[in-house]
Amino acid sequence: MSIRILLVDDHSVVLDGLRMFLGLDPELEIVGQAADGTEAVKLAHALRPDVVLMDLLMPVMDGITATGLIRRQLPEVEVVALTSVLEDEKVIGAIRAGAIGYLLKDTEADELRRAIKAAAAGQVQLSPQVVERLLHEVQEPEAPEQLGDYEQEVLRLLARGRSNDEIARALSVQEKTVKSLIGDILAKLGVPSRTQAALYAVRTGLVTLDEAAT
């Protein structure tokens, strides 16, 4: 089954380019596009994509606000932030809002396609440098509930960049069980995304910075 993608950007030339690059991969299906955050939230509800590629700077409603709304209302939909310049404030805002990762708009087409597939698989992909930066900037969850041993093992694998399928195979369970467990983990930690859960794992020593997703 193909990965369903919603494109969000207020520049038509960017949308056209993304359509061209992504359309070359038979595993990817573009189901819609939006020009601002408000439209993105509406289309996310209507289309239920697997992944939203979200521009951060847009009129009406910015991408960070839209990301937060989508992640709270549709937690099964992953969001990858798109940015033209790597600005700490914007990237951190996107991660806080629940984005699983981010990409620069000049990212090579192959890397873009890989990142979308990784996001659809629930795979956190951040460089050690970015993880280190986010550890200093993204707030630690307030009074998180304690995780059980099994949940800690799932979180450890998630923080190491394993996909849902890889975690399922490592633990000899079904993929839907992994998704349910991760949902429980996010709820207990009080965080909106796998990325913030992975940061929590590094902070608490469950994994080292070197072990964290790359």
Go through each PLM region and give its residues:
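Active-site residues of response regulator receiver
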Residues: 9, 55, 83
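Acidic catalytic/metal-coordinating carboxylates
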Residues: 36-39, 61-65
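Short amphipathic alpha-helix used as the core "switch/output" element in two-component signaling
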Residues: 42, 64-76
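Active-site beta3 strand of CheY-like receiver
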Residues: 47-53
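Receiver (REC) domain active-site loop signature in two-component systems and cognate sites
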Residues: 58
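Short, flexible helix-to-coil linker/hinge segments that flank and couple to helix-turn-helix
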Residues: 89-96, 100-153, 206-209
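Recognition helix of helix-turn-helix DNA-binding domains
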Residues: 161-196
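Basic, Lys/Arg-enriched C-terminal extension of HTH/homeodomain DNA-binding domains
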Residues: 187-214
